[in-house]
A protein has these predicted regions:
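N-terminal structural segment of carbohydrate-active enzymes
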Residues: 1-125, 133-135, 140-144, 149-158, ...
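Alpha-amylase-like alpha-glycosidases and glucanotransferases acting on alpha-linked glucans and related
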Residues: 1-2, 10, 90-91, 100-117, ...
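Loop/helix patches that line or flank the sugar-binding groove of alpha-linked glycan CAZymes
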Residues: 2, 17, 21, 26, ...
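Beta-sheet entry/capping signal
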Residues: 4-6, 52-55, 123-127, 249-252, ...
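Short, flexible loop/turn elements at secondary-structure junctions
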Residues: 11-13, 60, 98-101, 132-134, ...
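A generic secondary-structure signal for well-formed alpha-helical elements
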Residues: 13-18, 46-54, 58, 63, ...
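Short catalytic/ligand-binding loop motif for oxyanion handling, primarily in non-cytosolic enzymes
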Residues: 15-18, 62-68, 134-141, 259-263, ...
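C-terminal beta-sandwich/jelly-roll accessory domains of carbohydrate-active enzymes
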Residues: 495-560
């Protein structure tokens, strides 16, 4: 697949123009975005950023403290729901749309199907979550197809483990978390979602969820009982097929490593047999298992959180020297094009937060690396392009530098850009308008320049270790090349203005098949008004340039 750009967005937040923002506020007080908020205009503006895919986060019905019993939806016990809105990752019904997101609750599935059609009409693709490891404690599907048994519906709850069961149980023990359960009763206790095999999870556990049983007996040395195929495998495959039939284009699979790789290889193969173009992205954090989840699990792409994200964050925060970026991509050993790069998502702290850089513009060079160093896809999180700081204390989600996934809230930067549905950016500051322009230029370059989407990469960092006019603690440089198209990237992670010189080794000319000594016209794709003299590419001539703080150059070299 050609390089693509994902825009992650929580519909709950995106279309909410209510600015009340009462701490721990209800739906009625703080409001909630809707699927219908993604109008043709909204989608057009998102696409104009250079986006190719939208990951609609929190689409599937999850536990909530909002009462929908008048629509035939069972009420959730508030003691086991995180936040008034509830976590998008505590799924309550795998076969339904979250009612919060519908203008008409009774037609919520049609509103989702219409959203998919609008998104495709805007020439964008649709990704949704698949949350396979855990469900809400009071999971019950009231929307499953006729004849589909509920998860846990046929379980033997007096058995701690059986491959026939969908959950794990703690026989003869009541659920007694280390918090006030306000009368909630669960007996026997089910095992909590983060592999907490005791009846008393803490506030730091995923106490609002229960773990699904894929036939691994954790209490007997992780014994695998996969023959015959466990019941959970069949039910979860059918859920994937259900959503694939809604014409979506991909799944982002939550905490994929907490589910056996054997299931993924089995299920993904069956889904792709019927829907060959659908993509699967795995949230993974164990580099030693990456190849296993690609080769045996059949995933198309994996999160590169532990490697490139952590590296770019530390480089931007000036904890690591910039030259360590080289070690990061080299450590992947050939699978770097199958990683998903990002600097923000719903789990991570905002770049502009006081916990990261304090200003979204400081991550411009890091974002250039994430987007252009390899052929891998790249993702941004709604509001990232607007400098969102994530420094609100919304309710269950405290002041932690993240935008809440638990509470009803209005995100100031998104509201300022959306301007009540006009999506004209009228309420943005000049600085944040400029930041959005940067993202728009960068991401469009990322998907249109063949040197980036299909080309070779040559890292120039090692060739400049001993260059006194290039600081490998603060600067980074590399080539991308496809046929006769050549790009030179020079990035400054320093907070100071400086002049720098980039040297070119003989190996670069050999690897990229560039003839030494040729002259090139230089154009900065991020600012085409900037003037450069002719560049002679040679081992004897360095490229000399001025660099502004926290900025990067994407230079297109045209032979003359």
């Amino acid at each position: 697949m050609s390089k693509f750009v994902i825009y992650q967005v929580l519909p709950r937040l995106f279309g909410n123009y209510n600015s009340t923002n009462k701490h721990n506020g209800t739906l009625e007080e703080n409001g909630c975005g809707k699927l219908n908020s993604f109008t043709a205009k909204a989608l057009s503006e998102i696409k104009s950023l250079g986006v190719t895919h939208i990951w609609y986060t929190g689409i599937i019905e999850h536990a909530t403290q909002t009462d929908y019993t008048s629509y035939g939806i069972a009420k959730d016990h508030p003691a086991i729901v995180k936040g008034k809105a509830g976590s998008a990752y505590a799924i309550k019904d795998y076969y339904d749309i979250d009612p919060d997101l519908a203008e008409n609750v009774e037609t919520r599935m049609k509103e989702f199907e219409d959203l998919v059609k609008r998104t495709h009409k805007a020439k964008l693709k649709v990704i949704i979550d698949f949350v396979p490891n855990h469900v809400a404690r009071e999971y019950h599907s009231d929307a499953s197809p006729t004849g589909v048994a509920d998860l846990g519906g046929n379980d033997h709850s007096n058995w701690a483990f059986s491959p026939l069961n969908n959950f794990y149980y703690l026989p003869n023990e009541a659920f007694t978390p280390k918090m006030d359960v306000q009368g909630y009763v669960e007996f026997p206790a089910k095992v909590t979602g983060n592999d907490c095999f005791n009846a008393s999870p803490t506030q730091n556990d995923w106490y609002e969820t229960v773990k699904l049983n894929y036939g691994v007996n954790y209490m007997e040395g992780h014994q695998k009982q996969f023959n015959p195929i466990p019941d959970t495998w069949i039910k979860m495959r059918d859920i994937l097929l259900f959503w694939a039939s809604k014409d979506i284009d991909g799944f982002r699979c939550d905490m994929a490593e907490m589910v056996p790789v054997e299931f993924w290889g089995w299920a993904i193969s069956q889904v792709k047999a019927k829907y060959p173009d659908i993509i699967f992205i795995a949230e993974v954090y164990n580099p030693s298992e990456y190849r296993n989840y690609i080769c045996n699990g059949k995933f198309d792409y994996l999160y590169d959180k532990v490697g490139m994200y952590e590296m770019l964050r530390n480089v931007t925060s000036r904890n690591f020297p910039v030259r360590e970026i080289t070690n990061s991509w080299q450590s992947l050993g050939g699978i770097e094009n199958q990683m998903l790069n990002f600097l923000e998502n719903h789990d991570e702290q905002r770049i502009g937060s006081g916990f990261f850089s304090g200003n979204g513009m400081y991550a411009e060079p890091a974002m250039i690396v994430a987007a252009t160093l390899t052929q891998a896809p790249v993702m941004i999180y709604s509001g990232q392009e607007l400098g969102e700081q994530g420094m609100d204390s919304e309710g269950f989600s405290g002041l932690d530098g993240r935008t809440t996934i638990f509470d009803y809230w209005g995100v100031n930067s998104i509201q300022s850009w959306a301007n009540g549905g006009k999506f004209d950016g009228k309420g943005l500051s000049l600085e944040h308008k400029e930041l959005r322009v940067f993202y728009q230029k960068l991401l469009n370059i990322t998907i249109t320049e063949k040197a980036i989407t299909e080309g070779l990469m040559y890292d120039l960092e090692f060739a400049n270790f001993d260059n006194p006019k290039f600081n490998t603690h603060e600067q980074y440089a590399y080539f991308r090349k496809y046929n006769n198209e050549l790009l030179l990237f020079v990035l400054n992670f320093d907070d100071k203005c400086l002049d720098t010189e980039v040297c070119f080794p003989l190996e670069a000319f050999q690897y990229l098949e560039i003839k030494e000594g040729q002259n090139y016209q230089v154009t900065n794709l991020l600012d085409e008004t900037e003037k450069f003299p002719l560049l002679t590419l040679s081992t004897k001539h360095a490229f000399i340039t001025y660099m502004a703080p926290w900025k990067g150059l994407i230079l297109k070299l045209k032979r003359v």
